[in-house]
Amino acid sequence: MEFYSIIKDRRILLGLTQQDLADYSGLSLRIIKSIEAGKGNPSVGTLTKIADILGLEIIMKVKEVNK
């Protein structure tokens, strides 16, 4: 599942509108819509703001390399 689908699904589960998420995060509605549509390239900072509001955690892990 792509990160933008997770954001949208979680927002809906919490009963928030895109405008609510924009207001709480300090981001524009245009940015929220763009992220949820899978467009653009949001920064880690932007994703962190959204994740905090939605109760999500961003985890980075080392990719396994087949030898």
Identify the function of each model-found stretch.
Residues 1-3:
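Absolute protein N-terminus
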Residues 5-23:
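Short basic helix-loop element that most often maps to the first helix and adjoining turn
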Residues 22-25, 51:
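Small-residue (primarily alanine) positions within well-ordered alpha-helices
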Residues 26-41:
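Recognition helix of helix-turn-helix/homeodomain-like DNA-binding domains
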Residues 45-60:
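DNA major-groove recognition helix of helix-turn-helix/homeodomain DNA-binding modules
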Residues 64-67:
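Short acidic DE-rich linear segments
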